[in-house]
Swiss-Prot record:
Forms homodimers. Interacts with ubiquitin-protein ligase UBE3A/E6-AP; this interaction stimulates UBE3A ubiquitin activity. Interacts with host BAK1. Keywords: Activator, DNA-binding, Early protein, Host cytoplasm, Host nucleus, Host-virus interaction, Inhibition of host innate immune response by virus, Metal-binding, Modulation of host cell apoptosis by virus, Transcription, Transcription regulation, Viral immunoevasion, Zinc, Zinc-finger. The keyword Ribosomal protein does not apply. The keyword Transmembrane does not apply. This is Protein E6. Plays a major role in the induction and maintenance of cellular transformation. E6 associates with host UBE3A/E6-AP ubiquitin-protein ligase and modulates its activity. Protects host keratinocytes from apoptosis by mediating the degradation of host BAK1. May also inhibit host immune response. HAMAP family: HPV_E6. It comes from Micromys minutus papillomavirus. Belongs to the papillomaviridae E6 protein family. Transmembrane segments: none annotated.
Length: 153
């Protein structure tokens, strides 16, 4: 006789949510959601939450709490992952030859802040002959925000 499947808990269901999906599911706004950083435990300010939202990373569920990752910790994590899990490095032409598809069709994250690159950012990276790095089965290169030097007033 087949075993009955255990119903998923609320937290297990939300484990696969991006921050945008979680906000819709909970029917709350970004500014009202209290979201701690998984790595440093500080509560993320509105700018950090907006950056996390734009990156389209999944919400972390730990100890019955939803958590994100602040930009400072995401930068540290991206650096550590590059150091430990970098597989190969090449320009977009090499990437396209390896995967058999145009870079615009690939999921590419920023090698510095883990943001999800837009189609135009991927095309810019290809035209500018930027380096693409394979880290944990995911291609990475710098996003527009990380490539652009900060303007000082």
């Amino acid at each position: 006789m087949p075993q009955p499947t255990r119903p998923y808990s609320f937290m297990e269901l939300c484990r696969e949510y991006t921050l945008e999906q979680l906000l819709k599911f909970l029917n709350v706004t970004l500014d009202t959601l209290m979201l701690p950083c998984h790595f440093c435990s500080s509560f993320m300010d509105l700018n950090n939450k907006a950056s996390y939202l734009a990156s389209q990373l999944k919400v972390i569920v730990k100890d019955c709490c939803f958590k994100g990752a602040c930009i400072k910790c995401r930068r540290k994590l991206a650096f550590a992952e590059r150091q430990k899990y970098q597989v190969c490095v090449g320009e977009a032409d090499l990437v396209e030859a390896m995967v058999g598809s145009h870079v615009i069709n690939l999921t590419v994250r920023c090698s510095e802040c883990l943001a999800l690159l837009t189609a135009s950012e991927k095309l810019d990276a290809k035209c500018e002959l930027q380096t693409f790095i394979l880290v944990r089965h995911m291609w990475r290169t710098s996003c527009r925000a990380c490539r652009t030097p900060a303007i000082e007033c």
